[in-house]
Amino acid sequence: MSDKVINPQVAWAQRSSTTDPERNYVLITVSIADCDAPELTIKPSYIELKAQSKPHVGDENVHHYQLHIDLYKEIIPEKTMHKVANGQHYFLKLYKKDLESEYWPRLTKEKVKYPYIKTDFDKWVDEDEQDEVEAEGNDAAQGMDFSQMMGGAGGAGGAGGMDFSQMMGGAGGAGSPDMAQLQQLLAQSGGNLDMGDFKENDEEDEEEEIEPEVKA
């Protein structure tokens, strides 16, 4: 087993708005191969992620990852959304506390250039081009299915607000529900629906969903 703690690679982009809180956010992609047992701590002024990689053929060591970022400005922890996709990338969407048109000049509070933090140019748009890009339908969150992300730093009780249409397969939403996603959302929300009423007819390759432990 490897005892070395590794800083994972981070890519980030952002949007800003003076009037719309939903368009005032930071997107972070953390790269951790074979991500396992993630533990996320979200505070207004910082985020911290701990995880490990599972052993596999050719590398039987367990690698430990840790990321701590003191953010340039405060965020709203309870609105944070996060998800592990394919066991390779940890996606986070952080909502900025202050509504303002100016971009953050950097992700971190410290004016230090960290070698493992990069700009995500695939999602980056200049401040004066935000409205134009959005009008063209080019979302900053391309490739991230935020409808299936886990929200908040502490979780919310009840099944209210769950969009079950997002879990339906087939044309026009007429297919069978995605049982793994349904069970995951119910587990997060404390729902008590009778799963016996649902039958899965089609087997599809799905993203590996790993529910992190989140600390408020």
From Swiss-Prot:
Other notes: Present with 33700 molecules/cell in log phase SD medium.
Similarity annotation: Belongs to the p23/wos2 family.
CDD domains xrefs: p23_hB-ind1_like (cd06465)
InterPro entries for this protein: CS_dom, HSP20-like_chaperone, p23-like
Subunit note: Interacts with HSP82.
Alphabetical GO biological process terms: chaperone-mediated protein complex assembly; positive regulation of telomere maintenance via telomerase; protein folding
Role description: Acts as a co-chaperone.
Record lineage: Eukaryota, Fungi, Dikarya, Ascomycota, Saccharomycotina
GO cellular component: cytoplasm; cytosol; nucleus
Intrachain S-S bonds: none
Residue stretches of each Sequence repeat: 141-156, 160-174
Modified residues (N-acetylserine): S2
Chain positions covered by the region annotation Disordered: 169-216
Keyword Acetylation carried by entry: yes
Record-annotated CS domain positions: 5-108
Protein name: Co-chaperone protein SBA1
Record keywords: Acetylation, Chaperone, Repeat
Comp. bias regions, Acidic residues: 200-216
Keyword Hydrolase in record: no
Gene3D superfamilies in alphabetical order: 2.60.40.790
SUPFAM superfamilies: HSP20-like chaperones
GO MF terms held by the record: Hsp90 protein binding; protein-folding chaperone binding
